[in-house]
Amino acid sequence: GITEAIVAMSPEGVDAMAPDNRERVAPHVRTLIAPELYRGPWRKGEKGLADKYAADADRAIDELDEAGYGTASLMVDTSFCSNGIPDVPKGYLKKVAAKVRAAGGMIIADEVQYGFGRPGTHMWGYEYHGVRPDIVTIGKPVGDGFPLGVVVTTPAILHAFMEQTGLFSTFGGNPMACAAGLAVLDVIEREDLLANCRDVSQHMKTGLTELMARHECIGDVRGHGFVTGVEIVSNRDTREPDAKTMVWVMNRMRELGVLTGREGHHGNVFKIRPPMVFSRDNADALVTAMDQAMREL
């Protein structure tokens, strides 16, 4: 999102829970502790992880009530990409959503990164998490390169919104953009790209995990479907983030013909989010490029 309202809500790129960064979001916004099992306060292997992380929603709801705002909604990127693509505890988002609804808020699922089959097991990230949202935002893959964004909601919510705002868009619902979006849906179904995602993503994750045996700089490999994170550290025992090495490897991979992204509060996590047509050969090329780059460190 590029509007002032969305920017005011986004903690992307900063640790929003750190005291010196809390003012980076608007006063009517509260951020939650990311359900991050690699370097978060509660880590993989501990019991009750979903409950422990979800409890932070109670704190946020109470603070909003005390400040006189109340709770309007939970807005969440269901891939948690900006948090470094953590392995989210099973049931976490469902528990948070229940707390928000009990406080009178709605659930807004941002599916720009995870939607259109990228979980592999489901078409949408909210389905993977077992949550039914009130509003869904969609972009990027929806048009396969054609500029298109979509907001999906219920007739009741849309009617109330239009009655109170009178929002009008000159380009909203233009036929060419809609045709592009429908064509993307047809291809996903006809070519069974969710099955391709399930197969290739597991193959790629296996290859990336095998690199850990050869390269000490890889601290963790995680993710689900075609959203995979590889965390780079300077020391596996202390889990010290190493953004400098990550950037060097990323740029060397680019020289080798493979593009990746960068995520996480420390800027040390590879974001690997390939297109749905990504093949096993493509995955092998990515793993080989990362291996070669790390051998050159």
Predicted regions and their residues:
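Conserved N-terminal phosphate-binding loop of PLP-dependent enzymes in the Aspartate aminotransferase
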Residues: G1-L297
